[in-house]
Every structure is written in C-alpha cells, then in structure tokens.
From Swiss-Prot:
Gene3D superfamilies tied to this protein: N-terminal domain of the delta subunit of the F1F0-ATP synthase
Annotated localization: Cell inner membrane
Entry GO terms, CC: plasma membrane; proton-transporting ATP synthase complex
Protein name: ATP synthase subunit delta
InterPro entries cross-referenced by the UniProt entry: ATP_synth_OSCP/delta_N_sf (IPR026015), ATPase_OSCP/dsu (IPR000711)
GO molecular function: proton-transporting ATP synthase activity, rotational mechanism
Source organism per UniProt: Ralstonia pickettii (strain 12J)
C-alpha cells in the first residue's frame, strides 16, 4: 500500500498543480470519477488485456467518464495507460483529495454512530468538531450498532472514541489490571 502511495504521489501533485491553475472544483469531480471508474474490476480487466492497444484502453476508459474531459486529462490517461499505471487512479484521486483539503484548510471526518445520525444532531456535532480542529469538515457518517451508544470520530490519524463500547473496554482493562 505504501508503494502505491509513493508511486501515485507525483501524479497527484502534478494533477493538483494543473487543477489549481484551472477550475479546481471541476477537476476534483473529474479526478474522483476517474478513480471510481479505474477501481471497477471490469476496467482493471480492460487495462490488463494484452489484446487491446494502449489507445484502445485509453479510449474505453475515457468513454466511461460522464464528466467533461479536458486535453490535460486525456494526456494523463494516455500517460497512465502507456506506463501501465491506470490502476493507480484510485490512489491518485485519494491523494488529490487530501491535497485539495489541505489547500482549503479542510478535512474529512469519519463519524461512526451506534444509531443513525442526521439533521440537527449531526450539524451540531460537525460544528463542534470544526471549532475543536479549526478546519472545515466534510462528514462521512456510518452506523455500527456494536458501539452500543455514543460516537467514534476519526479525522486523519486522530481518533475520538466516546462510544459505550470503548468505555466498557476501558472499565474492563481497569478492573482486570487491579
């Protein structure tokens, strides 16, 4: 996994520089879509098919995109196909997203709750987390009933676990240590 990140980083950084010079929002959507399409098993099979020419693989990939494709994006796809690195696009997209967030002072936050969390409670939680971390946060919410109650929040490498399960685990550790 670290190797993929290392190989994808220069592509993501170059792509981000191009995107900053143009329309960052449109590029962000396009790069996300490219990453999603490249992750599809059928597209991986097309990329690895020795019977298809590089131009055919690039053409098939580009035809699967719904977003408008610029000349630079076509060149990127051609370069990745020529170097047999089309399958790097999901990692390139992930790193591009991290670069965009960093430039905008934003971050993704993974919120896991024991019960569905939406509306006003979610808005309040995100606002509190934004004040705590000093960043604009994009929340991704999931439900995990095994938490029993409370929430588990992950922003980058930092984890805040206020779930009942975490508290029970702490209590168990304290009781068995005594």
């Amino acid at each position: 996994m670290a190797e993929l990140a290392t190989v994808a980083r220069p592509y993501a950084e170059a792509l981000f520089r191009v995107a900053k010079a143009g329309n960052l929002g449109a590029w962000s959507e396009l790069v996300s879509e490219m990453g999603q399409i490249a992750a599809v098993p059928d597209m991986k099979a097309v990329a690895d098919d020795p019977k298809l020419s590089k131009a055919d693989v690039a053409g098939i990939f580009l035809s699967a995109l719904k977003s408008p494709v610029s000349h630079e994006a076509k060149e990127l796809v051609g370069l990745l196909v020529a170097n047999k690195r089309l399958t790097l696009l999901p990692e390139i997209a992930a790193q591009f997203h991290v670069l965009r967030n960093a430039s905008e002072g934003a971050a993704d936050v993974e919120i896991t709750s024991a019960f569905p969390l939406e509306g006003a409670p979610l808005t309040e939680l995100v606002a509190t987390l934004e004040r705590k971390f000093g960043k604009k946060l994009q929340a991704h919410v999931s439900v995990d009933p095994s938490l029993i109650g409370g929430v588990r929040v992950q922003i980058g490498d930092e984890v805040l676990d206020t779930s009942v399960r975490a508290r029970l685990t702490q209590m168990q550790s304290a009781l068995t240590a005594a």
